[in-house]
Regions:
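Structural core segment of the AMP-binding/adenylate-forming
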Residues: 1-2, 25-96, 417-423, 428
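Short beta-strand->loop structural element characteristic of the AMP-binding/adenylate-forming
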Residues: 7-9, 16, 20, 24-55, ...
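AMP-binding/adenylate-forming catalytic core of the ANL superfamily
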Residues: 8, 16, 37, 54-56, ...
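Conserved pre-ATP/AMP-binding loop-to-beta segment of ANL
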Residues: 79-85, 98-120, 127, 151-158, ...
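Conserved AMP-binding A3 loop
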Residues: 116-143
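Conserved AMP-binding/adenylation subdomain of ANL enzymes
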Residues: 139-158, 166-205, 219
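Gly/Ser/Thr-rich phosphate-binding loop
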Residues: 178, 203-208, 217-287, 300, ...
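Conserved ATP/PPi-binding loop(s) of AMP-dependent carboxylate-activating enzymes
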Residues: 294-298, 309-339, 375-377
Length: 432
């Protein structure tokens, strides 16, 4: 029925993509399910959003048993692959529904208020909340994607979906579908396989989290494969260091870009265009490599203090936004919705600032600020110089309880293979 929560629980798989589009066409609300999360946490979320249908990959049959037992709202469970033990497969489900009349959702306005997806938040401060993303929100995201991610060159598009489609990569597929682009689906990320696909399948667009982007940069094939088909490598979901941007331009050419958004304002609150990255890497406004780009045309952004006042240009505050990209709120969580929508704005929970040219800079998550000895320390400001050290692959800085200072700063560092660095060396390099 219209508005039913329809969960798709699968690794990257062509049938999973088909199920997402089919659910939307039938009027359901797509619920992406993280295959890396525990069965119990997935069951908790699916029960919360009152899931009616669950489409799953056979490799997850054991976890499905846990979910079914804990989700009383379920009406049907369908396996999207070959599984002799499944009560129903995608083939039998389609045969059974062959003559079912699909409602015509088309109207002159595209039913903008209908819920497209109940997207889980990151759950960093508790159980995930279900973000009610409407058709109107997605149309806005697609329009922004067509403008900033695809542009005028719409012929012969080949998009490689290699990041999990249970996250932003799943929503991006729809942008390419609107212009008849081809999407290749890789079940998981392998840097060598991605580079091979770019060369042999003439991939034009790819979306990657920073860790995968770094793996591509460091792979020996990155400098030997023919990657000339690439038009954009969109890196998002976490900050990218300026040095990694510069290396990306050297290795891949002027195709690397970055965007900023969140489930509550999907994907494109701001966009750091490839030409801006390339220019900044060459020395024209190099500070822009620290930004997440200019605010997009359909979105209004303000930097607010805790009382809802706009702070002066260049000063730090909470990044807040409004416009047709911002979602309706959280499923069955009116208090959480009200808390995020104060002073007439959606509050992202991110601390940042705007410059005079409308470039947006993110400093840190508001809740990730470390207070040590009465001083406010943003984790990203400690992470940045560590990430700039040769041999450092990844870094995360956290605050840990400290009897003297309240909190002390701890850095968790992952080194490139074969690199040896002692903690004292890192501290000596980054300490003021």
């Amino acid at each position: 029925e219209a508005g039913d929560s329809v969960a798709v629980y699968a690794p990257n798989h062509p049938e999973a993509v088909i199920c997402v589009f089919a659910a939307m066409r039938a009027g359901g609300a797509w619920v992406p399910v993280n295959v890396r999360a525990s069965a119990s946490s997935n069951a908790e979320y699916l029960a919360y959003v009152e899931t009616r249908w669950l489409f799953y990959h056979p490799s997850l049959r054991q976890e499905v048993g846990v979910i079914v037992a804990a989700t009383p709202s379920l009406k049907g469970v369908v396996c999207i692959g070959d599984d002799d033990d499944a009560d129903e497969t995608l083939d039998t489900f389609c045969v059974r529904g062959k003559h079912t009349k699909i409602p015509d959702w088309s109207d002159p306005f595209g039913v903008p208020e209908r819920v497209f997806s109940r997207w889980p938040t990151g759950g960093t401060t508790g159980p995930s909340k279900g973000v009610e993303i409407t058709n109107g929100n997605m149309v806005t995201m697609y329009e922004l994607g067509l403008k900033h991610y695809i542009g005028d060159e719409q012929a012969d598009i080949v998009h490689l979906a290699v990041a999990p489609i249970t996250h932003a990569a799943g929503a991006i597929i729809g942008i390419f579908a609107t212009v008849g682009g081809t999407t290749l689906v890789h079940e998981s990320f392998n840097a060598g396989a991605v580079l091979e696909a770019i060369e042999h399948q003439r991939v034009t667009h790819i979306f990657l989290p920073p860790t995968a982007y770094y793996a591509l940069l460091d792979h020996p094939d990155a400098t030997t494969r023919d990657l000339s088909s690439l038009r954009q490598i969109l890196v998002a979901a976490a900050p990218v260091s300026p040095d990694k941007f510069r290396r990306g331009v050297e290795v891949f050419g002027p195709v690397v870009c970055q965007c900023y958004g969140q489930a509550e304002a999907p994907m494109l609150v701001s966009m750091l265009e490839p030409q801006v990255v390339a220019a900044a890497a060459a020395g024209d406004h190099p500070e822009r490599l620290n930004s997440c780009g200019q605010v997009t045309s359909c979105t209004q952004v303000a930097i607010l203090d805790d009382e809802g006042n706009e702070v002066p240009l260049g000063e730090r505050g909470e990044i807040c936004c409004r416009g047709p990209l911002v979602t309706a709120g959280y499923f069955a969580r009116p208090q959480a919705t009200a808390q995020a929508r104060q002073f007439g704005w959606h509050h992202t929970g991110d601390i940042g600032y705007l410059d005079a040219h409308d470039y947006l800079y993110i400093v840190d998550r508001k809740k990730d600020m470390i207070i040590t000895g009465g001083f406010n320390v943003f984790a990203t400001e400690v992470e940045a110089p560590i990430l700039a050290l040769p041999g450092v692959l990844e870094c995360a800085v956290i605050g840990i309880p400290d009897e003297r200072w309240g909190e002390s700063i701890k850095a968790v560092v992952v080194l490139n293979e074969g690199v040896a660095l002692e903690p004292e060396q890192i501290i000596a390099e980054v300490r003021p």
